[in-house]
Amino acid sequence: MRTSQYLLTTTRETPADAEIISHQLMLRGSFIRRLAAGLYTWLPLGLRVLRKVENIIREEMDKAGAQEVLMPAVQPAELWRETGRWEQYGPELLRFTDRHQRFFCFGPTHEEVITDLIRREIRSYKQLPANFYQIQLKFRDEIRPRFGVMRSREFLMKDAYSFHPDQTSLAQTYNQMYETYSRIFDRIGLTFRAVQADTGAIGGKTSHEFHVLAASGEDAIAFSDKSTYAANVELAAALPPTDKPASPKETLSLIETPGQCTIKEISQFLNIPSSRCIKTLLVQGSEGELVALALRGDHELNAVKAQKLPQVANPLQFATPEQVWKTCNASIGSIGPMGLAIPLIADHGAVQLTDFACGANMEGKHFTGVNWGRDLPEPSTADIRNVVDGDPSPDGEGTLSIARGIEVGHIFQLGEKYSQAMNATVLDETGRAISLAMGCYGIGVSRVVAAAIEQNHDEHGIIWPASIAPFQLALVPINAHKSARVKEMSDRLYTELQAAGFEVLLDDRQLRPGVIFADMDLIGIPYRLVISERGLENNTVEYKRRQDGKTCAIQLDNFISGLKAELKAPISRR
């Protein structure tokens, strides 16, 4: 492809509304253009990347025995009412009526549609297991679409659904999809972690997320430095301390703390570390009354863990300021675990403390020198906090590190949730009707593109992994419009490279070399070949590798073989 015939409109300025680097570079590099909030047109350069991601996914899914289908994006409300999700889904589900006043939605996911298909097509256990996938546009009416294609309203997704006669068969396909996803992200060239995850609204009991590691990631993941253990922070278990609590040394004291409301303010005011403070949170209980949760001041409440406690309402709801005052006779900044007439659950780390500080349930006052068992009863305990760097790994091997991740894939063992709701059954070997066990497996295809940029860029632009780069090679003739020899050689090499199977972008624009070089760095083409009068005098072409900046001269004699040798050379990251 020649740039003079290509839609390539790069910019030097960073768009004001582009918050993260992938959004900035995709706009500046002419990969996407915004149509409306959360809606983007993929330009030719971006579409080449998107299609390469698609092709890798398709090849690996086909290799795993999955069958490709294409289901309607528009779905009738009747199917969603069968599972109850028409009522359960919020405003992110785009609903509308046709001319006959029948309700439909633009599908954000396809569990209902595929289950309806399978209950009509598959009758016997002999047809199982079966795994079907599609690569299709979805729509979720995000309240605040942001970050470009990272969190858009319309997005491209690979979603797969497997059906099984029993849980054993489901587990086998689930493990196969886990390995397939690992191969997909390896082939794309991403550094990622597969982590245990919460099943959320989709349901089921077992789930893993696949996260691309990047500083801009919205999710926190925990992984061991000595084993393969990895989990979303919301699921990573914080093990109880093994040391015995220290013996109390202080006496209970009531301290005036006017205007000191946060843990940071209290610890500074009392001149003690936040790890020796207790923070108390009031939440709605499952039986209607409030429940108090106590944590160390330097720890964060884990909502997923808390709402799984039988005493706590699910989803987690914090008490209102009015409820807090009515229960504790104090505002939120002055409440504590002492003297409460409601159930109290303390995190394992909080129970380990001695001589700690906490709110006194009196406005503007705190206790110091507080000890469990002496000044207040020993509480019920549970793991209700987020893990932190340095915590012991739950598998007993090594310690945990916390990193930011971008979720690009999610797999679930759904069990019989949808098949029972929609009466999807088959006959087993005895002729008895059984509900199908089901798995679902998603990859955010357009999100993978953005995540790859978040992980692979520098101050000059994108550094695409070679497997998904829009072109393999950028061919840059210097002043070809002034030099017949340079133009002739660039045209010849362009033809030879294409014939040899290379994907080549020939930049034949009449621009200054510095501008062209900057554009090629911006759009991230892995390898650059520069043809100049000086090089031709030496019968060479300059070769530069985008990833590590390595440059060398390649002889025009046996040019293709010399280039292939350079492409196979090891890369040292900067």
UniProtKB/Swiss-Prot annotation:
Entry's transmembrane regions? none
Please provide one cellular component term from the Gene Ontology annotations of this protein.
Answer: cytosol
Q: Does the keyword Lipid biosynthesis apply?
A: no
One GO term (biological process): prolyl-tRNA aminoacylation
- E.C. numbers: 6.1.1.15
Main location class: cytoplasm
Catalyses which reaction?
tRNA(Pro) + L-proline + ATP = L-prolyl-tRNA(Pro) + AMP + diphosphate
Q: Where in the cell is it found?
A: Cytoplasm
Class of this enzyme = ligase
Q: Which family does it belong to?
A: Belongs to the class-II aminoacyl-tRNA synthetase family. ProS type 1 subfamily.
Q: What is known of its domains?
A: Consists of three domains: the N-terminal catalytic domain, the editing domain and the C-terminal anticodon-binding domain.
Write the protein's name: Proline--tRNA ligase
- Originating organism: Nitrosococcus oceani (strain ATCC 19707 / BCRC 17464 / JCM 30415 / NCIMB 11848 / C-107)
Q: Which gene encodes it?
A: proS
